[in-house]
């Protein structure tokens, strides 16, 4: 989650946010 959070913090691509959020959920579920 922290990795994707860092990406979101430095990226204005709002369309990627849902994708990164999904990756956060997958990683936290492992």
Swiss-Prot record:
Q: Which terms are listed as keywords in the entry?
A: Amidation, Amphibian defense peptide, Secreted
Which terms in the GO cellular component ontology are assigned? Answer: extracellular region
Does this entry carry the keyword Secreted?
yes
Which GO biological process categories is it annotated with? defense response
Tissue specificity:
Expressed by the skin dorsal glands.
Q: Provide the family line.
A: Belongs to the frog skin active peptide (FSAP) family. Rothein subfamily.
Instruction: Tell me the protein's name.
Output: Rothein 3.3
Organism the protein comes from: Litoria rothii
